[in-house]
Amino acid sequence: MAYFQDRKTSSRSLPSYINHSTQNLVGPRKDETNLSEYMKLRLLQSPSQVIYNLENTVSLYRRCLNLRKRLMDISELAAFFDSIHREALNSSFKILEFKDIEFDDPVTEIWLFCRLGYPLCALFNCLPVKQKLEVNSSVSLENTNVCKASLYRFMLMCKNELGLTDAALFSISEIYKPSTAPLVRALQTIELLLKKYEVSNTTKSSSTPSPSTDDNVPTGTLNSLIASGRRVTAELYETELKYIQDLEYLSNYMVILQQKQILSQDTILSIFTNLNEILDFQRRFLVGLEMNLSLPVEEQRLGALFIALEEGFSVYQVFCTNFPNAQQLIIDNQNQLLKVANLLEPSYELPALLIKPIQRICKYPLLLNQLLKGTPSGYQYEEELKQGMACVVRVANQVNETRRIHENRNAIIELEQRVIDWKGYSLQYFGQLLVWDVVNVCKADIEREYHVYLFEKILLCCKEMSTLKRQARSISMNKKTKRLDSLQLKGRILTSNITTVVPNHHMGSYAIQIFWRGDPQHESFILKLRNEESHKLWMSVLNRLLWKNEHGSPKDIRSAASTPANPVYNRSSSQTSKGYNSSDYDLLRTHSLDENVNSPTSISSPSSKSSPFTKTTSKDTKSATTTDERPSDFIRLNSEESVGTSSLRTSQTTSTIVSNDSSSTASIPSQISRISQVNSLLNDYNYNRQSHITRVYSGTDDGSSVSIFEDTSSSTKQKIFDQPTTNDCDVMRPRQYSYSAGMKSDGSLLPSTKHTSLSSSSTSTSLSVRNTTNVKIRLRLHEVSLVLVVAHDITFDELLAKVEHKIKLCGILKQAVPFRVRLKYVDEDGDFITITSDEDVLMAFETCTFELMDPVHNKGMDTVSLHVVVYF
């Protein structure tokens, strides 16, 4: 009989957020006098006793089947069941309804026996009482008031003649409600009256058949299933009985807490939420299961049961979502719960019972999968069973998704409170939080633990400021609420810049490598996830996000990208950066959300809008707001162009690039992944994305350049003014306006040079006074932007020397070690070109953009952006 012993639930059936210390009840203690009532119920009975009690007390179907047989043995009541049976067939009221399937339904018939009222009056008249009740068998459920009047007289006489208390009776109003709880109480009343009848009638009492031996009542359903070799069905049935017993015990425990006022009503509701709804649903499910088991094997349709009740499984969503909160409330109120420790020990027995619904909803897919594997060939309802399997998988996924959304909402609230400096960003522009976790992140052979949050539009990496180590969560008497440490924003990458996501088994079984477009090449970092479930979740979410970014229509992208013109900043956004120090070495290069990449000129904004991602500058620089004509900075409008081949670019013109120098932090450049390494890793996994990574990105996505959108509806260029230029070492102030290159007749942009003249209107042209001897160079070193004014005929060696001197003078690099620099510019096709000679310098200067420096006298200077890579 080892099969009947309690078996531990497999950990595979539990979601990752469940505390595994509360999966199962602990074993029996040596001193049996200290056992709680629940443990006595489970441990101090033989296996055969447990199964017998489960089948004849927990099973609503078997109880009603036995009661119907005993009631029909009373001659005065037998005639009533014909009309009750007809009423059950014709009425819309049923305990469970299957389309096109008819079952013997003793539960509905006994429920009608109570609702009609007159059958109970007839049962009362069979007892040795002085006063009889009127029995009107012609009424139906349509005459509800007449039925209630009969029930009232029945209740009154039971109290007066039989001395029954309210605890032994049921509520008249509740018996007409759809809940099964009043029916369970009504069954107790009927059983009590039948017992009195059998005691008073000695002849019938001696011949009354036992519920366990009657030939017409299926005895030992579980034993029959095991004997026939249907062990999976037997496990489903046995565990369902035990599960409902646990739910009923929890429900009674909750009532005792209310009666004794151990906890407040709100706290009790917060712990148990909709436990009674789950209990009611599971009773109906068990009725449907036993209806099926009462049929021959070839006619049983378990798949139809799950299909019919798919919608009803939604009751689990609320309970499973609230479970972490319930766990914490149990911990916080353990001292009060110890007052009823004789019923349930609060530190381990109560949490172990409270987790049962979550375990059960995760167990159904496993059981049905085993049923499908053991289904004999030729079973006529096999396809229906597969559909039932699909239903229960959907239910489990929906429960998990609801729980995930709830956790994500809480995570966003917690994230907003914990981050000490948002650097001017606002959570409201990040989109929906898709997934988050605390994982180890590897880049450039450095591994650190980060809080990683993947939103629809950005990936954030945050680091805990506290040096305290996280302690494993456990349920104990002395456990206190965990203090939330502050988080520091360390890395941020636009999801539109992510190009490839692949597993990396060289770094671990559950490692994911994410490639993104950096400056000047593709870069990557590795997330070391903790288990297979997390690995599958992150891969699935990232792949869906990549597909959405690549296949989303421009209309959808623009719609998703639209953001309010005046953002509402976080409470911490006003805090300014303190500058770079040795502790600020970022594992991931931080990205400015208000500095995006080139965008196609075919998409334009008719009006100028303030960027929602303008960051607050440091205290040494004046705060300024970047004004552009972009619909949004988060969504890449030219995702195909940015990484496409030259053939794709032949039909598209590249926008002129100007820079936005707003920045709040500076970071030492990380080691850049080589393209050959990327291709090698992708080839290992047969990932067909080489066309996206074998060519370096045609624009910087790390916040070093932005696009100018021309208003094609007007030939008048919007004037753009820049802040006065100095040669000091301050980070450049954000520009407010800038002239852009000329426009072709088809609306595309022309590459601008120092000889390009700018028209102020479509009919008149005015030449600006330009400085033809000097060139202003904007040096891009990651998020730092420096300004250098040089002669137009400067040589390559002189330019390198001036750039190195500028970097040393500004003190950007704290390490006093020798270094070299490499300069690059962006050509007309958007490609990065390395400067290696004097000719390259002249070619770079040919891409200059004229910027108006003095709007009063219409004076300006040619400006070029050069990207700096530092080598140590």
From Swiss-Prot:
Cellular localization per UniProt: Nucleus; Cytoplasm
Parts forming coiled coils: none
GO BP, sorted A to Z: activation of bipolar cell growth; division septum assembly; establishment of cell polarity; establishment or maintenance of bipolar cell polarity; intracellular signal transduction; positive regulation of mating projection assembly; positive regulation of mitotic division septum assembly; regulation of conjugation with cellular fusion
Entry keyword Cell cycle: yes
Protein's UniProt keywords contain Nucleotide-binding: no
Keywords: Cell cycle, Cell division, Cytoplasm, Guanine-nucleotide releasing factor, Nucleus, Phosphoprotein, Septation
Compositional bias (Polar residues): 11-25, 560-584
Pfam (any one): PB1
Top-rank taxon: Eukaryota
PANTHER family: CELL DIVISION CONTROL PROTEIN 24 (PTHR47339:SF1)
Name the UniProt record assigns to this protein: Rho guanine nucleotide exchange factor scd1
